[in-house]
Amino acid sequence: MFVKSTTRHIRIYAAEVHNSELVESDNMLTLDVDPDNEFNWDEDALQKVYRKFDELVEAASGEELSDYNLRRIGSDLEHFVRNLLQNGEISYNLKSRVLNYSMGLPKVESPETEGAYNL
């Protein structure tokens, strides 16, 4: 079994994709963002996740390729996705197979609460 990290919205594998199959690799990581399509993504938001992934991998270069190190990267990316959601850069996909609001209930502004909950 190859080294991997899986969170709700981020999956990282020490593998390459060949003919739609993952093949173990010691020098290639494969990133799968939001595999259940829980969020609505635009290209800019996805590119931010990819850039953050590249930064985290670069920062970890020279370290052992282990489940632990990949989980650290995956956890950091999961928090990054949460920030994108909280900043309104992505939103919940209301047509998703399952609506579980895993990162908190959606914020809906109303005239009574507009601006009242700014952090």
From Swiss-Prot:
One of its GO terms (molecular function) is oxidoreductase activity, acting on NAD(P)H, quinone or similar compound as acceptor. Its EC number is 7.1.1.-. It catalyses: a plastoquinone + NADH + (n+1) H(+)(in) = a plastoquinol + NAD(+) + n H(+)(out); a plastoquinone + NADPH + (n+1) H(+)(in) = a plastoquinol + NADP(+) + n H(+)(out). Keywords: Membrane, NAD, NADP, Plastoquinone, Quinone, Thylakoid, Translocase, Transport. Pfam families: NdhM (PF10664). It is a peripheral membrane protein. It is found in: Cellular thylakoid membrane. It comes from the Bacteria. InterPro entries: NdhM. Belongs to the complex I NdhM subunit family. NDH-1 shuttles electrons from an unknown electron donor, via FMN and iron-sulfur (Fe-S) centers, to quinones in the respiratory and/or the photosynthetic chain. The immediate electron acceptor for the enzyme in this species is believed to be plastoquinone. Couples the redox reaction to proton translocation, and thus conserves the redox energy in a proton gradient. Cyanobacterial NDH-1 also plays a role in inorganic carbon-concentration. NDH-1 can be composed of about 15 different subunits; different subcomplexes with different compositions have been identified which probably have different functions. This is NAD(P)H-quinone oxidoreductase subunit M. The lineage of its organism: Bacteria, Bacillati, Cyanobacteriota, Cyanophyceae, Oscillatoriophycideae. The gene is ndhM.
